[in-house]
Amino acid sequence: MGARLKTGLWVRAVLRRISSDGTSAMVLKKGDEDAGAVLIVLTDRSGGTGVLREDGSGWTRVDASDAASVDAYLERQKQYDPDLWIVELEMRDVSQPIERTLGSRRLDLDEEA
């Protein structure tokens, strides 16, 4: 696995960037400052919800489309990984892609090409 930005630094940068676009963003659970995994909870005003998890080079949407399944997923992940970060973004529409805006913590993406 290649070099990555420290999680705390990456989360703060994403919060600043997302907030500057008018999207509400907050940390629901602070994990390990250096190497914690990150889950992104997506919500919108119409009640839509979703979860993004990091994969090797970006983000994957988790199969959790209602509040109860999102909460259950988050609880399982917190038990499995105490270093986990959980960030919530309130968007206009959770079905719209935000994965590219989030980017990746990896510093070596060009090496795979």
Predicted segment positions?
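Polybasic/polar functional segments that serve as interface/processing modules
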Residues: 1-113
